[in-house]
Amino acid sequence: AIAKLPMDEVSRMKRADEMGYNRDAYHGSTRDIREFNTVFGNREGHYGANHYFTNSVDDLGKNYAGEGPDLTQRITEKMERLGDEGIEPSRKAAKEALGIENKGVSYPVKLKLKNPVKTHGKDETFFDYQAKYDEDPSSDYYEEFLGEEGKFIDLIDDTKRVMRNWNVDDVDGVMAKLQDANMDMEGISASQFEDVMRNNIYDLYHPETGQMSSVGELIADVYKTMGYDGVEMGAYKAFGPQKRGGGRWGGEGYMTKGMEGLDQDTLHYIAFEPHQIRSKFAKFDPTKS
């Protein structure tokens, strides 16, 4: 007879850790989720139609467990689009189109992120760059340029390929902005890369579905192409209070309010594939990893 797996919490969490599901997180949804997919994913989300999680119960309660700011905006936009399509724009119709089935449920999960891009945090991913020269020992002035290497080169190559696949209007202009961001010739951070992309690409449509999409989904495609399996984001630095104004224009500027429910330790996780996500109450059967 096949021995049954012990189902006490200690045994399940031990198996979860051994299988790589070692990050505790929460997902807030107005859908009754049996398994994760992107059917009702928001292509205009910060990283497009991927899977979003937080490590903070406070963040979850304030922003994601019900009709928080993001979902309220999506409902309003959907109502406007229904009207454009000749359908009576009601909240009920918009909710049905968005797959909203309840008033908000919190899902505790275990995530398997082996190689996430880290952004807006203390140890964020850095795409390094090195220019290689062969110094002529007989000359104090002559150096032969041998080439370039580093993660920045991979980033540039993969970004160009993905942008062309997405039919971005000004690929060369965006590439020039990325090169400008590497002015010190040492490389750029993930947040610097994202700032350039988000500030210089507009009016995107998904190459497969034709749906309007966010620059974030293109960014996620770049990360996937480079071999990353998700994103770990310092949410407070990304979405907390931000300074506006001042700087070289003079004056003290001002601080925006930012999202509620965040603190310096709040992390947002974005998983690219459904198999990276398991309910905290799953069996964690090694034969079904």
Predicted regions and their residues:
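Active-site and NAD+-binding cores of ADP-ribose-processing enzymes
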Residues: 1-289
